[in-house]
From Swiss-Prot:
Belongs to the CAF1 family. Signal peptide: none annotated. Its EC number is 3.1.13.4. It is found in: Nucleus; Cytoplasm, P-body; Cytoplasm, Cytoplasmic ribonucleoprotein granule. Has 3'-5' poly(A) exoribonuclease activity for synthetic poly(A) RNA substrate. Its function seems to be partially redundant with that of CNOT8. Catalytic component of the CCR4-NOT complex which is one of the major cellular mRNA deadenylases and is linked to various cellular processes including bulk mRNA degradation, miRNA-mediated repression, translational repression during translational initiation and general transcription regulation. During miRNA-mediated repression the complex also seems to act as translational repressor during translational initiation. This is CCR4-NOT transcription complex subunit 7. It comes from Mus musculus (Mouse). GO terms for cellular component: CCR4-NOT complex; cytoplasm; cytosol; nuclear speck; nucleus; P-body. Pfam families: CAF1.
Length: 285
């Protein structure tokens, strides 16, 4: 089977509080053979800017991420499981976790909520039937999906995505220093390939996830701007790029563990502060 072939029998499983335990049991089995985990989140935008002096633009970008992740709540998490060849498990390949979120009580950016509502996010259901993040974290910690060097995470411009996951897993605010953030990141997610970071070595590939998918001639399954569909498309893009641009081998020393827009992946931002989130927010447009 060629890498990242689309099989329309793929199902995206919706996970709410009522079926969380049952679906996490399935994931504990799936991860044994399908150890490539493509991930995406949906979150309520950006509501704050850090103030003060910053050592560098890279430092500013991390502080921008930190203050927003600390203030806001995750809305959705999508996880798609694939094997070394880019093949999916039979039946369900993608789980979309829907978290508790209350438009009356929780902070958000209005434009982000409008986009997510248009994309089919059911905020009333999130309020009434959403998953509690702390309980989800307990299940994820023992799932074999995190804290495992054999699991390879695939993402797209994913500083904020991993920021929210680290906040959930540690049940605390993000560390003040970016170096400490990357230390925690390596603990929970020892192997990460950020597709947007890989694109730096791919001639002519540019833009957000949807634009990249179109350039790679990939067909989306499910609605854009929902975490399940976006995680599935991220996984497809990784395997298609690996085949087309990397001769089916990614140099870990060069690419593993780098997040586009943060740390060593932040050199692309040279024209002032504040633009990394804007690109992040429109990454699937």
């Amino acid at each position: 089977m060629p890498a990242a072939t689309v099989d329309h029998s793929q199902r995206i499983c919706e996970v709410w509080a009522c079926n969380l335990d049952e679906e996490m049991k399935k994931i504990r089995q799936v991860i044994r053979k399908y150890n490539y985990v493509a991930m995406d989140t949906e979150f309520p935008g950006v509501v704050a800017r850090p103030i003060g002096e910053f050592r560098s633009n890279a430092d500013y970008q991390y502080q921008l991420l930190r203050c927003n992740v600390d203030l806001l709540k995750i809305i959705q998490l999508g996880l798609t499981f694939m094997n070394e060849q880019g093949e999916y498990p039979p039946g369900t390949s993608t789980w979309q976790f829907n978290f508790k979120f209350n438009l009356t009580e929780d902070m958000y950016a209005q434009d982000s909520i409008e986009l997510l509502t248009t994309s089919g996010i059911q905020f009333k259901k999130h309020e009434e039937e959403g998953i509690e993040t702390q309980y989800f974290a307990e299940l994820l910690m023992t799932s074999g999906v995190v804290l495992c060097e054999g699991v390879k995470w695939l993402s797209f411009h994913s500083g904020y995505d991993f920021g929210y996951l680290i906040k959930i897993l540690t049940n605390s605010n993000l560390p003040e220093e970016e170096l400490d953030f990357f230390e925690i990141l390596r603990l929970f997610f020892p192997v990460i390939y950020d597709v947007k970071y890989l694109m730096k070595s791919c001639k002519n590939l540019k833009g957000g996830l949807q634009e990249v998918a179109e350039q790679l001639e990939l067909e989306r399954i499910g609605p854009q701007h929902q975490a399940g569909s976006d995680s599935l498309l991220t996984g497809m893009a990784f395997f298609k790029m690996r085949e087309m641009f990397f001769e089916d081998h990614i140099d870990d020393a060069k690419y593993c563990g780098h997040l586009y827009g943060l740390g060593s992946g932040s050199s692309y931002v040279q024209n002032g502060t504040g633009n990394a989130y804007e690109e992040e927010a429109s990454k699937q447009s």
